[in-house]
């Protein structure tokens, strides 16, 4: 049973509130809290000059600012603290604040606690954004007013009073957002799980436990959708309190969703043919199977089929940038883990020239070499992990005699220029880094846009 948002409005009036992080989602949050009558102090590592007009706007509204390297030193004496998702709950500043009696929360926790409308939460190591987007397209296609948020879309907490009982809310939720989530989510989807973000999580188990929070607080009416072919997500079944539905690209699941002989089935009814789906690759077949199960009570098979045959995909996900002299260039910048890169490579019908490497999340690259080599024609490595990735491919050669030609470069532009010189007519070049972007770019979107800019300049 969702709580009445009027309770929050009454609670927050006059409260001394700290908001950690002045990012995309927290700017509307801060403005909303001010409008609700809270006394807000915003904290950020950036300085006044870096914040620019944002700081000026907050100053005019009476928001206090704590900025710079030691910005958390004054996170004291607050009634409520909204933390940024990437801030660990066991950080020194938050531990101290909780001991002082502060209520520590996040925008997403409060949104899920109070929002009206059916909530669909999607998480996983790979496929979150595409599955989230497919689910939103299915619901919109059925005629529902649909709100998309979390890791994608727009910040929703400030829109909460515009969301109605009959609306649908679709949230992409990261492990960071889920670490402190204790709210019930009506429909929970976990696409798959593999090692990821181990630079932020203390262990793989902590990462898995964070993901479990998407379903662990459900009641008997909740629905959990998981991947039958992923050992970790399949294991979630024994802990689920509600209904569980599984999807598979490898076996028939009469009570779930499955792929067989070129056809996608939902509870043993044909939905569409694989070859008619616009976005290619078996990973996208799995994304559709998950989305079909998540929306089976709200969306007709006819709408599902139509969306599959018309939805053209999400930017930075195996996105065709252009074809030059018979060479196709794809932007798969979202591929920030080896498993995601493998999924992208398997979508092509031939060996490809791969540009990889980037920020080190402390996850193993062995799968990229030992499972990925059949799909790689040439490998161009860049970024902080290039030597680490090369070592794994060198081990592959030493152990199995399988050699992939590897080129080492210093920049993305050098990588693209080299790929252009190597490629022959009919070849495919893909940016599929298997790593995060933070060593070279602020996020995967900026990395992908830079790749597209370089390719378009060739």
Swiss-Prot record:
Query: What's the Enzyme Commission number for this chain?
Result: 6.3.2.9
**Endoplasmic reticulum keyword on record:** no
Q: Which reaction does it catalyse?
A: UDP-N-acetyl-alpha-D-muramoyl-L-alanine + D-glutamate + ATP = UDP-N-acetyl-alpha-D-muramoyl-L-alanyl-D-glutamate + ADP + phosphate + H(+)
Signal peptide extent: none
Q: Which InterPro entries match?
A: Mur-like_cat_sf (IPR036565), Mur_ligase_C (IPR004101), Mur_ligase_C_dom_sf (IPR036615), Mur_ligase_cen (IPR013221), MurD (IPR005762)
Q: Which GO terms describe its cellular component?
A: cytoplasm
Q: Which family does it belong to?
A: Belongs to the MurCDEF family.
**Name under which the protein is recorded:** UDP-N-acetylmuramoylalanine--D-glutamate ligase
- The organism encoding this protein is Clostridium beijerinckii (strain ATCC 51743 / NCIMB 8052) (Clostridium acetobutylicum)
